[in-house]
Every structure is written in structure tokens, then in C-alpha cells.
A protein has these predicted regions:
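Iron-sulfur (Fe-S) cluster-binding segments and ferredoxin-like electron-carrier domains
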Residues: 328-332, 345-371
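Helix-rich terminal scaffold detector
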Residues: 1-30
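C-terminal accessory/binding modules appended to enzymatic or scaffolding proteins
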Residues: 301-335, 351
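FNR/FR-type flavoprotein reductase catalytic core
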Residues: 1-11, 126-308
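Ferredoxin-reductase
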Residues: 35-137, 156, 192-194, 221-223
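Short cysteine clusters
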Residues: 338, 343-346
Length: 371
């Protein structure tokens, strides 16, 4: 007996064939929707964005805002105020990437503003500030990062402690609140070394005068003789005076150099602010390993080691240099984002040897067990 005779003997088979024929003649063709979910996901979370420098704005003698738009004239992926993108560049023959917080508001979809300050020991920031020009093209990741303002869960009383270029995500949060007419109180406590280091100085001061629910407090730690503003570093006493009653009920954001972040966390702990009410930005270069309590003190930072990339080659570097930097300098690119270990995107398998992991890196139990 043939297969067709067997199928015809199955109850309901002919009815199904008839229904299939009717659907083919009268039904809707959904083939155009094939891959639509993937296309939507890519538009929201692209692996790479093709960007063009639309404008360059000088903020301070060492800081510029780079305005980046889509090369294709498209709206850029949405982001949350406080997040960053990873910018990919080739500098002095090294293909590398650096995370930069988005300074513009999430309500602005036509461009991303990245405010970049030249780092003392950095070479990417110097390239971007000194050599980048309007019309130049770049690639970036999509927006990412856990450091952001959540208007639903972070309450109505927000305090941002910023040091130096740590004001960049603060600006994005502030503009987002103001442009959406959200009435959360926003207090920016902004610390800089010198008067001409203050980024967005005129803009922030003007907004503080215009909006009653935005408070700006500035400190200069190395003032000139004729400086009239507040000077010195933050202390628990100063913070207590600025925050008033019930500091435990406020939501705190901290962004600045690593020592600044650590100091602010300690001050808030002294004021008994719960850890759950503190958000700290962790992207950027990790702090020196010998400043961390888990570092083996008898190992010198300039001690040389050999790194072997299985099947691809080997090179010599020093133990004090982040492994990601060493790999990139020798032509081995590893997908990365935060560069501090916080996001874990650069995770690779350790076959043999020993690698020091900074405190901010989030290793899973399986990472520790299997390398």
C-alpha cells in the first residue's frame, strides 16, 4: 500500500489538506515578517553603530564634547540617562576601544554627545580631543551600562556626587529630568581641582538659577588666591550639612576618578546611607593592582611575564598593565566595553598561569572554577 493510501485512511487528513489549500489561496503571506524580531532587536541593541562627527564643542582647555550622528541618517538606539557607548578607534597602529558616557539627553535621538577629557596617561582621549575632526567616521557599540537613573524606582530626591568628568552622566540625567518636566529634586555636588576644570560651568549654573528643584554645589580643591567659591574636599560633616535631614532616604549617584568614588562611598557609609541607595559608575581603567588589598605585595608591577594566546602567538608584558591593554597593543583584539571588569564582556578562558582580578570585576562561580 502506498503512503498516500495510508494517509487517506487517517481520519481528518483530507480536511487538513483542504484547509491548507484554502489558506494558500486566501490566507495572509507572512514571509515579509521573517527575521523581523532580529531586525528590531538589532535596532535597539546593535553590536556596532556607524557614526559621523557632526560637531566638536570645546568645554575646557582639556575637554571637548564630540557630537556623533548616524552615518546613515537614522535615529540612534535609545538609552537610559547615565549609560555609555564603547568607541572603537585605531591609534598609533593599535585597534582599541574606550567607554564614554553619553552627555546628551535620552529624549534626543538624532545624536549622542560624548564629553571627553584628556586623561593624564591616556592616549585615546588625547587622540579624540586633539586630532578628531568634523566629518570623520567612527564605530561604537550600542548603549550599555548599569549606572543610570530609573525614574520609577529611584525616588524623588536624587544626589549626584561628581568629580572631574564625572559630571558627564550627571548632565544626561539632569537634562532628561528637565526636558520631561519631571519634578524629582536633583542636587549635583561637583568637585574639581581647578576653576578651569569645571565642565558645563555656565550651563549648569544657568539651569540651577532657572529650576528650583535643581541645586548645584561646587568645590575647588586647588583654588587660585582670588577664587570666591567653596574650596576643599568633601567630608562627612560637609555632606551632612548639604544633605540636611534624612540622607538615608535619598538616592545617590557617584562618578569620578577611582579615589574620589571610594572616598564618597566611605563618607556615605559614615552617614549610614544604605548601600542599596548608592550607584557607582565603574567603567574606565581599573585602579592600580598594588593599591588593592588582595594584591600579592612581593610582586613588582614592572615584573615581566610571557602571555601565550593559544594558536596565535605570544608576547612579553609587565604584570602591572591590564591584560586587555597588553593584548590590544600586541594585535589581539578582545570584545570589551567597560575596561574595568565590571561588565564581564572581555571574559576569556585562562588555560594556565594566574591572573589577578580587580575588586570591581564580577566573576561567576563557574569562572573561578573553570578559568
Amino acid at each position: 500500500m502506498s503512503d498516500l493510501h495510508i494517509l487517506n485512511a487517517v481520519t481528518g487528513y483530507q480536511e487538513i489538506i483542504q484547509a491548507k489549500s484554502e489558506l494558500e489561496q486566501n490566507g495572509t503571506d507572512f514571509s515579509e515578517y521573517k527575521g523581523q524580531v532580529q531586525r528590531i532587536m538589532h535596532s535597539l541593541h546593535p553590536k556596532r553603530i556607524d557614526l559621523i562627527v557632526q560637531a566638536i564643542i570645546e568645554e575646557t582647555p582639556t575637554t571637548k564634547t564630540i557630537r556623533l550622528a548616524s552615518q546613515h541618517g537614522e535615529a540612534l538606539p535609545a538609552f537610559q540617562a547615565g549609560q555609555y557607548i564603547n568607541l572603537f578607534v585605531t591609534v598609533a597602529g593599535t585597534y582599541t576601544a574606550r567607554p564614554y558616557a553619553i552627555a546628551s539627553s535620552p529624549t534626543q535621538a538624532d545624536y549622542y554627545d560624548l564629553t571627553i577629557k584628556k586623561a593624564d596617561a591616556g592616549f585615546v582621549s588625547h587622540y579624540l580631543v586633539d586630532q578628531l575632526s568634523v566629518g570623520q567616521t567612527l564605530q561604537s557599540s550600542g548603549p550599555m551600562g548599569n549606572f543610570h537613573h530609573n525614574p520609577l524606582f529611584h525616588g524623588d530626591d536624587l544626589v549626584f556626587l561628581a568629580g572631574g568628568s564625572g559630571s558627564v552622566p550627571a548632565r544626561s540625567m539632569l537634562l532628561n529630568l528637565l526636558e520631561q518636566n519631571l519634578q524629582q529634586r536633583f542636587h549635583l555636588i561637583y568637585v574639581n581641582s581647578f576653576e578651569d576644570d569645571v565642565i558645563y560651568a555656565e550651563e549648569l549654573r544657568a539651569l540651577a538659577k532657572q529650576y528650583a528643584h535643581f541645586t548645584l554645589t561646587e568645590y575647588i580643591t586647588r583654588p587660585t588666591a582670588d577664587y570666591q567659591g567653596q574650596t576643599g574636599r568633601l567630608s562627612a560633616e560637609r555632606l551632612s550639612e548639604l544633605l540636611g535631614t534624612e540622607p538615608k532616604q535619598k538616592m545617590f549617584y557617584i562618578c569620578g576618578p577611582t579615589p574620589f568614588n571610594q572616598s564618597c562611598q566611605q563618607l556615605l557609609a559614615e552617614l549610614e546611607v544604605p548601600a542599596r541607595r548608592i550607584r557607582v559608575e565603574a567603567n574606565g581603567a581599573p585602579k592600580a593592582p598594588n593599591t588593592q588589598s588582595t594584591w600579592t605585595s612581593d610582586i613588582a608591577l614592572n615584573q615581566e611575564v610571557t602571555v601565550t594566546v593559544r594558536g596565535k602567538g605570544q608576547f612579553t608584558t609587565t604584570v602591572g598593565e591590564p591584560l586587555l591593554n597588553s593584548l590590544e597593543r600586541h594585535g589581539f583584539f578582545v570584545e570589551n566595553a567597560c575596561r574595568s571588569g565590571e561588565c564581564s564582556l572581555c571574559r576569556i578562558k585562562l588555560i594556565s598561569g594566574e591572573v589577578f582580578t580587580p575588586d570591581e570585576a564580577h566573576l561567576r562561580r563557574s569562572d573561578r572554577q573553570f578559568g
